[in-house]
Structure formats: structure tokens, C-alpha cells
Regions:
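Generic, well-ordered alpha-helical scaffold segments in large soluble proteins
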Residues: 152-159, 163, 174, 178, ...
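Mature extracytoplasmic enzyme cores
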Residues: 1-226, 233-234
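Generic recognition of stable, solvent-exposed alpha-helical segments in well-folded globular domains
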Residues: 144-152, 170, 186, 190, ...
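Extended amphipathic secondary-structure runs
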Residues: 101-108, 118-121, 239-255
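Phenylalanine-focused residue identity feature
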Residues: 87, 144, 153, 195, ...
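Hydrophobic targeting/anchoring helices
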Residues: 250-318
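Beta-sheet entry/capping signal
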Residues: 36-38, 51, 114-117, 169-178, ...
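Short, Lys/Arg-enriched charge-dense amphipathic segments
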Residues: 188-203, 244, 277-289
């Protein structure tokens, strides 16, 4: 009202990846007495803003990346000062799964008060492999299950090297999985059991945090989301990359694969390369002054570090 201004927050936008199509949520401390906001962006290159939404709700900073919906650098530092009343009390979360019928109709006598109902389900990612000929194109397999790896191997390499395949009899000695271009995955059929086995506590009570809500407090939510991303990393590593390595070696093939973790999918890039006979990355140099193709655009250095860690050769596809 008196015409004065004050800075609410200043930060560097997290580094993202080339398949990131998710919004970015930035949290700030509670503020009062403000009716006009000014948002300034200093960017090296031209950048368009599709939509800007201001909200009074408490959300986790950059939760889209924290929850594994996309891969970005994570924001660390002091948590915003927000009223605890805006956080979700875990003790007040009610599981209504048994109150919903098979058609998705909810029958529930809600206690007095204001309630937010989260209807959570899962479908496939909507991604298909490519580039590929029409007869070789289909839905991406489940990367968090051994069955997914087995199905992908059997449907492609297995046909080539099988008794009726054109490469039967030892004609093929290796296989390469190219760059990961199927965005991210966040669920599998037995995700709750897998999470509890790896993290040591039930998942369901914390599901709201995967959608940006602050459960209990910022620090506790951050710790849960760390366990969540670790589960995603472990499942993709052991079920898919480990499964593909098992299938390859069982058929006398060496396995090379390019980056997924540190490129598109959140995960431990040093961990999953243990299943590569040849860890690979890719690089190119764009003719214009752009981040695309630069040394940090692809995780080249972590790939080389993984090769040194496991004492194996590193490959490059350029």
C-alpha cells in the first residue's frame, strides 16, 4: 500500500533435460499485504512462458523433479517459511480405496470439514519406441519389472537369434541399447510392495507428496521423495538393465547401452552401468551457441567415471 517493494525470492532455474515437458513449481515463504507481483527472468537465450500461475498452497519446491516425473537438478537450501496448517498431517490421511467400486464411483460419508480427494491410478506411459519401422513399433515395456525386460528381448533380439531367425547359430555376438527417449516412468504393478521392501516403510500414506503436497513438513517430504527416487533407480537398474544383461549373457551376447540415468531418467548413473559390458554416451557439437550438444548436455563425464570404476572400456556413438 505504501508503494514499497521487497524481494520474495531469487534463484537459478534448475537445469533440465531435452524431454522435460513438465511445469516447474517454485515455493516461497508466506507473504502478506502484497497485491502486485513482478517476476523478472534473466536468460541467455530467448525463452517463452506458456503459463504462469500463482497459488497460496504449500507445495514442495520443484516437486515435479523431486517426485521423478522428470529429470532436473534439485534445489537445495533453506526451506521456505510456511504455515504448518498448510501442510498435510499424515494422521489425517484416509485411504478410501475400499469405498470406490470397480467403475470408479466413490461412496463415502465424509466427516465435517473441507477435504481434498486424490484419485490415483496408473496407465502405461503412452510412449512408443522409435525411430523404428512400423512392424517394429509398439508400446514401451515396463522398465520396472523383469517381465518387461524379458518381453522386449524376446520380441526383438530373441526373434533374430532364435531357431527360425536370420541370425541363428551364433551369427550375432553383441547388442546395443541406444539412447533413452521414452521420457520417465513412475509406476509398476507391484510398486507398493517394491517400495516397502527397499525403503522399509509403506508407500500409500505418502502418495500425496508425489503430487506436490507437503506431508508433515518440508524436510520429511524431502526425505520421502529421496526414497521414492531411489526406488525408481533401483527398479530400473535391477529389473530392466539387469534383466537385459541376463538375457544377453545367457545367449552369448555382450551388452552395450547408452545413458538413461543422468540424461532423462532420475537414477544413479554409476550404479546401473555395472550391467554394461560397454558403457556408452553420445555427443555432438551444435553449430550455434547453444547448450544442446555441450559437454554437460549429456552425462559424458559420469559415463567415463563408471567405466573406470568397473574397469571396463567406454564406448561412444557420435
Amino acid at each position: 500500500p505504501d508503494g514499497s517493494t521487497r524481494k520474495i525470492r531469487s534463484l537459478q532455474i534448475p537445469q533440465s533435460n531435452w524431454q522435460d515437458e513438465s511445469p516447474i513449481s517454485l515455493a516461497c515463504s508466506d507473504i502478506d499485504g502484497v497485491n502486485t507481483y513482478r517476476i523478472s527472468i534473466n536468460n541467455r537465450h530467448t525463452m517463452g512462458i506458456g503459463r504462469l500461475r500463482l497459488s497460496s498452497a504449500a507445495v514442495k519446491d520443484n516437486w515435479e523433479a523431486e517426485a521423478g516425473w522428470t529429470l532436473r537438478s534439485l534445489i537445495r537450501g533453506q526451506h521456505p517459511e510456511q504455515a504448518k496448517e498448510a501442510f498435510i498431517d499424515p494422521a489425517r490421511i484416509i485411504d478410501l480405496s475400499d469405498a470406490m467400486d470397480t467403475k470408479g464411483n466413490l461412496s463415502w460419508n465424509a466427516p465435517e470439514g473441507n477435504w481434498t480427494i486424490l484419485r490415483i491410478g496408473h496407465v502405461n506411459t503412452g510412449m512408443k519406441n522409435g525411430p523404428a519401422p512400423a512392424e517394429g513399433t509398439g508400446w514401451e515395456c515396463d522398465k520396472f519389472s523383469s517381465e518387461g525386460a524379458d518381453a522386449q528381448f524376446a520380441g526383438y533380439i530373441g526373434r533374430l537369434i532364435g531357431p527360425n531367425g536370420p541370425l541363428y547359430g551364433g551369427m550375432l555376438d553383441g547388442m546395443l541399447m541406444d539412447s533413452w527417449e521414452c521420457k520417465t516412468q513412475t509406476w509398476t504393478a507391484n510398486m507398493e510392495q517394491e517400495f516397502e521392501q527397499l525403503a522399509g516403510y509403506p508407500l500409500r500414506q505418502w502418495l500425496p507428496a508425489i503430487f506436490g503436497y507437503v506431508v508433515k513438513d518440508h524436510e520429511t517430504t524431502t526425505r520421502f521423495l529421496r526414497d521414492w527416487r531411489a526406488t525408481i533407480s533401483s527398479l530400473a537398474t535391477e529389473k530392466f538393465f539387469g534383466g537385459m544383461a541376463h538375457n544377453a549373457h545367457a545367449n552369448g551376447l555382450t551388452l552395450a547401452f547408452e545413458t538413461a540415468f543422468g540424461d532423462i531418467l532420475p537414477g544413479d548413473i554409476l550404479e546401473y552401468y555395472k550391467y554394461a559390458d560397454v558403457p556408452m554416451c553420445e555427443f555432438w557439437r551444435h553449430p550455434s551457441d547453444t547448450f544442446v550438444g555441450s559437454i554437460n548436455f549429456k552425462p559424458i563425464k559420469p559415463t567415463a567415471s563408471a567405466a573406470r570404476l568397473y574397469g571396463i572400456l567406454v564406448g561412444n556413438f557420435a
